[in-house]
């Protein structure tokens, strides 16, 4: 959704809200949320990772149609390529060989391989803003972004719509600023050390005017043990924010993701996200976050250079009424409840819109012949020559009639 070009204005009942009241989203804000921009500042509390600057040649490879992976081991033609017209070496002169795409970015290819080894043999990749979470369907590791080789990394990156968004649409919805264009983006590949994450311990925090106004879990499943931990988790997140992010991050509005494993006393910064519609509000809505009533700061407007620093202690004349209101307010902490629809698997799986049918994946894995056979059968089904079967039907069951799907 494009960002509005005007700030929020007062509306009456006769003037309904027609768009989310975001302030203009700047390109500089998007750049501030790029991993390489903030990682050095907060490195001590982030997950172990390495950043590799990317070259135009590597970016061109990511943008190319199709998936051609570098050869990791020596490969040999199948026996049927040998015939009477073969050369003295025994191989067909007409055999086509794909050029190795990594030859165009050999240094980066080498860096990726060395970094994977340095980080223990398993990594999770991402670009400046996004990880290829929507492409895990194609991974050899079932529903995982774990990569053990450079080719694992390339396969996920080239199969992801999220990565394409980083490359082609990073500034979509931003206010016009001729001084910043896509050419100003220094794209990087981030490789994080892989470890088995407990999804129940991941949380997204929303910051407005340098104050956390909402916290929620990232994984949309029900975890009953989290509810008694809300005070502990909220306190840990608030203390981390006040100590680390509140006064140092360049923008006053943003969201950030944290990981808090047992014993729930150490906060790890996972990501910083733009305060923009492109960021998933998860258990909140953007309208809630933008219009939520929050007590004003004790001494004026937050993030204002004209506001003096808070005193260490209140004066004797201060009746403390405002302090009570301020100190008594806490950000809402939302979790999936047992009876919430999100807690059950009736809805579509996460990122299902980015996945391909299993039949297509299996056909592609079997090579060109498999795809040709799949396309031929699909055309025959569309023309009525071949019957479509309902899910769960057994084509070998002679007792039941095969019922065609009417579309």
Swiss-Prot record:
Its main location: cytoplasm. It comes from the Eukaryota. ATP binds at residues 126, 129, 131, 133, 192-195, 202, 204, 218, 257, 271, 273. Residues 73-101 are annotated as: Disordered. GO terms for cellular component: cytoplasm. Mg(2+) binds at residues 271, 273. Keywords: ATP-binding, Chaperone, Cytoplasm, Magnesium, Metal-binding, Nucleotide-binding. Disulfide bonds: none annotated. GO terms for molecular function: ATP binding; magnesium ion binding; protein folding chaperone. It is found in: Cytoplasm. Residues 90-100 have a biased composition (Acidic residues). ATP-dependent protein-folding chaperone for the eIF2 complex. Binds to the gamma subunit of the eIF2 complex which allows the subunit to assemble with the alpha and beta subunits. Belongs to the CDC123 family. This is Translation initiation factor eIF2 assembly protein. It comes from Sclerotinia sclerotiorum (strain ATCC 18683 / 1980 / Ss-1). The lineage of its organism: Eukaryota, Fungi, Dikarya, Ascomycota, Pezizomycotina.
